[in-house]
Amino acid sequence: MNSEVIKKGVERAPHRSLLRATGIIKDEADFQKPFVAIANSFAEIVPGHAHLNEFVKEIKEAVREAGGVPFEFNTLALCDGIAMNHPGMRYSLPSRELVADSVETMVQGHRFDGLICIPNCDKIVPGMLMAAVRLNIPTIFVSGGPMKAGRAKDGRPIDLISVFEGIGAFRAGKIDAGDLLELEQAACPGYGSCAGMFTANSMNCLCEALGLALPGNGTILAVDPRRSELKKWAGRQIVELIKRDLRPRDIVTPEAIDNAFALDVAMGGSTNTILHLLAVAQEAGINYPLKRVNLISARTPTLCKISPASSLHIEDVDRAGGVSAVLGELSRKPGLLNLDCLTVTGETLGETVGQVQSLDPRVIRGVEEPLSPVGGLKVLFGSLAPEGAVVKTAAVVPQMMRHQGPAVVFNSEAEASAAILGGRIKHGDVVVIRFEGPKGGPGFMEMLGPTAALVGMGLGESVALVTDGRFSGGTRGACIGHVCPEAASGGPIALIKDGDLISYDLEAGTLELLVPQEELAARKAAFTPPLRQGLTGWLARYVQMVAPASIGAVLRPACGRPPGEQDYE
């Protein structure tokens, strides 16, 4: 056991003395048991994490009962919703790296034998996933659970995105201040990750497909008593994984990442999932090509449309059978999933989900009667995005699947939001927001403010938005993000001028800037990236280390196994 280095032998008497002082060691027999790290992420200001201080207790009890010794520690958690649309959002994606590094530091410093990760919200899940494959000790994930959808006064289900879009509706005179207040008060009824197929719930679902979480992890509500049984199972199962020496890199293989993307596109997950899965692959030493997402999306049908793409929420998916039902339906068509991949259940994916069926085809369609024959995410390439851009096609209306329009260019999210809410954008425009990439922002801010404003102002079905920033999982509409190379690196997006024609075709996977090459070359020669003044602290270091979005915006040098050790095509 790893932990023997801190508890075995005469030389470790001081270590044992300190361990006794914690109160965790109950008797001498505890020194013979595996030490299990429990990486919690409790934070009172984050509704998806505010309950985790109580949540963890049953997990620790189950570890004890199974023959392990649990040691809980905490890492940071940032609420993307509260950080949205102000400078705090610059810290959102960088916080992913801090989560990964803090978990690595605690586990390596104390030589734990196994790890239980308790994340829930947007950057905490991928941060812990990155740490898990980096550390490569037996690990299991159990999330805090999704939030129940709210209810408007007319009974319709609502969520946080309803409030963001309500701001635009209020500015457009469609609702009054009282209506907006009612949305605000009803949209988020309690603990849990926000109720739609946004980034947090997308990532918690993908943990099941990757094989690192038990069935039910992604969809059982935070307030559902069944989550108690899931926690106890996780506490028992980690001890079994330690006995079997089943490690994350035995589970998170290139084929397992394919499975995660298949689930992702079948459920119309957040575009952020592409960023995060690429980062997890990098940490596992896998060079996973961005273009492969299109291959998977082209062969994988869309079986669900969840908020923001419909009025359905994660609780509806759970009622219909959860992630296991989606994977079970996909497994009925050969070639969509790699069913031999291992999971933390101790079984293969096929053994875990092969007999599970949808309990409600209105929520989870069968593979032979899908909502769409192709998946809900797409990677675009072209003269505006030579290294790629991403879009959630599942949330795009049919008339915006192809579009050509004049660019209206902004050098920050704040400028764009003000223009949209000020009525300066018209039908047919292509809003361009640049210098918001990983390096240029810095921090790769989410553009939920402007995208929600477009919907609220009645422009969501006639205006496109293109950015080197990224989007909330709650974004809907023709919103194309992660444009690479980003403006701060001199990518073509930096050269766009107001009125330039931009064309895209989401089915063909193209994104083009319709400006002659000679003109672009002249603009490139004259281009000087703007200097961001006053950048200090962590973000100043982040700018120097962050890699492009096309490989997950990880920090260089890459951690884990050396990059290129395992190429995947």
Swiss-Prot record:
[2Fe-2S] cluster binds at C121, C194. Binds 1 [2Fe-2S] cluster per subunit. This cluster acts as a Lewis acid cofactor. The keyword Lyase applies. Mg(2+) binds at D80, D122, K123, E446. Keywords: 2Fe-2S, Amino-acid biosynthesis, Branched-chain amino acid biosynthesis, Iron, Iron-sulfur, Lyase, Magnesium, Metal-binding. One of its GO terms (cellular component) is cytosol. It comes from the Bacteria. The keyword rRNA-binding does not apply. The active site is at S472. Homodimer. PANTHER family: D-XYLONATE DEHYDRATASE, D-XYLONATE DEHYDRATASE YAGF-RELATED. This is Dihydroxy-acid dehydratase. It comes from Desulforudis audaxviator (strain MP104C).
